[in-house]
Amino acid sequence: MRRIVYQILFPLTTAMIWGSSFVAQSTSADHIGAFTFNAARCFAGFLALLVLIPLFRRFDKQPVQPLSPQEKKAHFRGLIWGGFCCGTALALACNLQQLGMVAGASAGKTSFITTMYVVLVPICGLFLKKKVPLTVWLGVMIAVAGLYCLCIKEDFTIVFSDFLVLLCAFAYTLQILVIDHFAPHYDGVALSCVQFFFTAVWSAVCMLVFEGDQLSWTALLSCMGEILYVGIFSGGLAYTLQILAQKESRNPTMVSLLLSLESVFGVLAGAIFLQEKMSGKEYLGCVLMLIAVVLAQLPAPKRKIAAIE
């Protein structure tokens, strides 16, 4: 039962929360600016994670090695620096995504274009001298075809809103690589908490610079439900469930595949709550993107793994 909860229920719940959060982002985009929304939701996520840190540590069974006062200070400084780097990358990613939605990108299309990062991350491993499995290269080719169906119009142009979301996928790739660098050295939830704080700070600075004259407390309060949902549930709860699933699961491939269903739930939520509709070509693009994401996460055959080692 415990394995079912951690390996299936937790990642599936996380994917549902992340997918449905695109609806909240889309409805907020009609009322407040991208930087205002992200400043508020990331601050809410920061507070949520601050509360969840003690709860998460109850589930963390790994022994903690005692540190000297000097080591604690060095560890804390490293945590802050790691959170700053991760938060800067996340601020770039989530603001590009929200700007794309403000410019008109639908919730469903945004969810699928964003998942392009799942394919891009292994490719970026080439620069770190990591082997890229054949399934990933196949996924890249299918993803390119999927992006063509989703984004490219009949006159071979791309809508500006889709272009911003595509840039967001590259920014999320950077953010994941930065997290991959710092995560092994620090508590995952604590790192995410600091990350959300700096993302909120960067977004607030951009809000004051670019949206200061448009800031309306009435509009902000009207979107408070969406802000709290995305901040607390998508940022705080879902991230914690993801970490618990990845720590406890004996099958990381299944967990990652279930998490990638975020894009499917995004399209379903957009259709149910926003009555969004896509063309046949765009639905084909969604299917191709999902196939590409699944291929990118499949483990390489054992013979190839042995050859690489």
What kind of region is each of these model predictions?
Residues 49, 132-152, 172, 203, ...:
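Hydrophobic transmembrane alpha-helices of multi-pass small-molecule transport proteins
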